[in-house]
Amino acid sequence: MSTSQTDNVKASTHATEYDSVTNNIVVAALYKFTRFADFEKYRDPILNTMLDNDVKGTLLIASEGINGTISGTRQGIDNVLDYLRSIEEIGSFTFKESYTDAQPFYRTKVKLKKEIVTMGVENIDPLQSVGRYVKPSDWNALISDPDVILIDTRNDYEVKIGTFQNAVNPNTETFREFPEYVAKELDPSKHKKVAMFCTGGIRCEKSTAFMREQGFEEVYHLEGGILKYLEEVPASDSMWEGDCFVFDNRVSVNHNLEKGSYEQCFACRMPITQAEMQSPAYIKGESCPHCIDKATDEQKARFREREHQMQLAQKRGEAHIGSDVIDVIEKRKAAKIEARRQADAANKTKAG
């Protein structure tokens, strides 16, 4: 198995360095495929460790492993990562870091799932078969080979704001559509060398394993994903074009792993440019040029009311700069969880 599955890998240098004053929020993206049969019992301990350290974000756990992105202070992130490593079934794992000056998540969640990344195909096991890992330093040479077909495994809206030169866009709306794309567009007898990439590497673990099962023998994928490539390859040598979409409030990051030039429509969640925000179709919290003709009147009314309630909450002082009503709600939930945990502990003490 590659070091991407077995070692705690974190580069010593980053495009944007940690700064205790400005870039003081650490964003850690992690995953590991592993045999995790009793994963359900770890949901609450993991969640409580995140809450105790004021770490936000979402972690998915399933019988096939763990996946997610979390953010917090340097000490908070280190404490959570140390706890995850202490779980025997998880142990060491790869994670990628970037830094920002504002909390990119509002919520703290640990979800129980059937899969840590959903492809919708049964019995795809990256622990048994997977593509060949290619380090960021070797990626340019591989994708410059005219015999290699380069495929972006991400969703269409991600591809549109940035991708590698000459990459093929499968035009999928979700990762579940990828197997259908392969069946229709790719042929092991014609496409002898296939290179694939995604944001952090996890989708390629599944997609390359699937490709191997379909008879594609020479399948490669970018180790650590786009984020690791942007971290390690200088912009002057880069074959990446545009921003990289990320699943948090930063929306996208540029080549320096700093917040990119995109915002997000809170109605449809699509990345939008500053120019699109000047469009008559853009109404904050309600619509944008991507969804103005897709949302029903009922949906628009619901979006409008949500935006209204958020503004009212801010006026009441329930939210403050750098936060919003969702953050307040999540803090209340966290307090309830803590109260329930203490009550359970007290009941167990009495019973004993």
Curated annotation (Swiss-Prot):
GO terms for molecular function: oxidoreductase activity, acting on paired donors, with incorporation or reduction of molecular oxygen. One of its GO terms (biological process) is tRNA modification. The active site is at residue 198. Keywords: Oxidoreductase, tRNA processing. Its EC number is 1.14.-.-. Catalyzes oxygen-dependent 5-hydroxyuridine (ho5U) modification at position 34 in tRNAs. Belongs to the TrhO family. PANTHER family: RHODANESE-LIKE DOMAIN-CONTAINING PROTEIN 7-RELATED, THIOSULFATE SULFURTRANSFERASE/RHODANESE-LIKE DOMAIN-CONTAINING PROTEIN 2. This is tRNA uridine(34) hydroxylase.
